[in-house]
Amino acid sequence: MNLINLILYFILFWIVFDFIRKNRRISFNDPPSPWALPIIGHLHKLSLNPHRSLTELAKVYGGVYSLHIGDSKTVVITDVSAFKDVTIKQFKNFANRPQPKSIRVITNFKGLAFADYDQWQKTRKLVSSALTKTKIKTFNNLIEKQTENLIESMNEFSNKNELFHPRKYLTKYSLNIILSMLFSKEIGKNESINKGTMERLTIPFNEAFKKVGKVDDFLWFLSPFFYFSNKQYKKYIFDIYYFMEEIYDQHLLDLDYNEPKDLLDQLIIASQGREKETVILVGMDFLLAGSDTQKATQEWFCLYLINNPDVQKKAYQELISVVGKDCKFVTSNHIENCPYFISIIKEVFRIRSPGPLGLPRISIDDTYLSNGMFIPKGTQILLNIFGMGNLLVSEPDQFKPERWINYKNQQQQKQQQQQQQVNNKNSIDSSESSNLEFFDDLEKVSNPFSLGPRNCVGMAIAKSSIYSVCSNILLNFELSSINNQIIDDNEVFGVSINPKEFSIKLTKR
């Protein structure tokens, strides 16, 4: 037998073995799964928008099903009860993260987003302490200042009758909030959006986002073919790290323990200056994830207002009924009195959830979900946030903020009925939960920031900045497209899902 035949026999054996391994059942309670191919598993079933592919598979295989993404055994959750099992009820068993190579380069698994449970506990405690000691009023002031700067820039476009290109300006807005909050730095009002700090951050960010989750994360033998792209990717990540390190070192020199000026000062004090790498990586988490999530949601808000002029008109009328026609700036105190506006933001989160698959998790031990399905140790878990907001609501592709108003009214009526049942000593149905039970239960099926202890730590800040910029854009400008054409609302998948770039015609109100 010559060497070539030996290699061919080995490859054939490997293919057959891998096919059997990927398709064998561990127990009678395994989640359902389509047939997996050897080597690639179910990668062929994923499109350029994997959240949509996974949602289509959920229509066939149900709210909990399994796939092999390359060699990674994965369970996809598009079920309310199972979602709660993973994020809350069995949180500790699903608290770890998978460790793909692309993420190792970014965080070394020491930051906040991708650290395993033990490291995450320490880091979360550190960040929570720093956030608690930083006054909420300070955050609100930072957000309002950046909102004013953005509106001023938009006014310049409106006065010149020029089309406004929202992406770079909303990116600058989102970055500035995080830079101000973390480091007391900002990209200057008159600083070009194409040069300086903006360029130094956005180019590495954009390149880093393109690499995360690529095929060589799941098929190890392809790594040699990605050698040069991986090398360039590492360079971009190190550029971001060195940018952060410069700021950290300067803060350490200027630190006043009695008067910390920003979140980075608080983190250095809380860590006693002993966790430099962790603190820097936490800052990278905020910059990489937070800025993109906020920017994407703000872009979708503008797009859906343009495509739904009746919604835009109704929201504006509500806003001026609260703030008055002479008001030129909406504050956080105004927002709570604008239920229709809040419903628009919630509908944006539902229909185009910025993180459609959340952050993946890993099961630490063998376990069973509340529906009886078996999850073996080491299984990757994908939380299909997009799918729940799509499959479990009526008319999912329709942008209907009214559904949230109606839902709130229905919930209030339901609570009154339940209270009446209790008063009448009637039994309340406690049948086993199912997706059918939760259909159109919007607060349960729409979870853009996930649930449980490992949800988004910056959720409150993200919501405040989104509410501020969106309400003030609405107050100051009527938004429309070129020639009043409908803007394409098909998404582009990435760390967040973004619309294709578009331009806005701004009409000053």
Curated annotation (Swiss-Prot):
<dbReference type="GO" id="GO:0005506">
    <property type="term" value="F:iron ion binding"/>
</dbReference>
<keyword id="KW-0479">Metal-binding</keyword>
<dbReference type="GO" id="GO:0004497">
    <property type="term" value="F:monooxygenase activity"/>
</dbReference>
<keyword id="KW-1133">Transmembrane helix</keyword>
<dbReference type="InterPro" id="IPR017972">
    <property type="entry name" value="Cyt_P450_CS"/>
</dbReference>
<dbReference type="Pfam" id="PF00067">
    <property type="entry name" value="p450"/>
</dbReference>
<keyword id="KW-0349">Heme</keyword>
<keyword id="KW-0812">Transmembrane</keyword>
<keyword id="KW-0560">Oxidoreductase</keyword>
<comment type="similarity">
    <text>Belongs to the cytochrome P450 family.</text>
</comment>
<keyword id="KW-0503">Monooxygenase</keyword>
<dbReference type="InterPro" id="IPR036396">
    <property type="entry name" value="Cyt_P450_sf"/>
</dbReference>
<feature type="binding site" description="axial binding residue">
    <location>
        <position position="456"/>
    </location>
    <ligand>
        <name>heme</name>
    </ligand>
</feature>
<keyword id="KW-0408">Iron</keyword>
<dbReference type="InterPro" id="IPR002401">
    <property type="entry name" value="Cyt_P450_E_grp-I"/>
</dbReference>
<keyword id="KW-0472">Membrane</keyword>
<dbReference type="GO" id="GO:0016705">
    <property type="term" value="F:oxidoreductase activity, acting on paired donors, with incorporation or reduction of molecular oxygen"/>
</dbReference>
<dbReference type="InterPro" id="IPR001128">
    <property type="entry name" value="Cyt_P450"/>
</dbReference>
<feature type="transmembrane region" description="Helical">
    <location>
        <begin position="1"/>
        <end position="21"/>
    </location>
</feature>
<dbReference type="GO" id="GO:0020037">
    <property type="term" value="F:heme binding"/>
</dbReference>
<protein>
    <recommendedName>
        <fullName>Probable cytochrome P450 519B1</fullName>
        <ecNumber>1.14.-.-</ecNumber>
    </recommendedName>
</protein>
<dbReference type="GO" id="GO:0016020">
    <property type="term" value="C:membrane"/>
</dbReference>
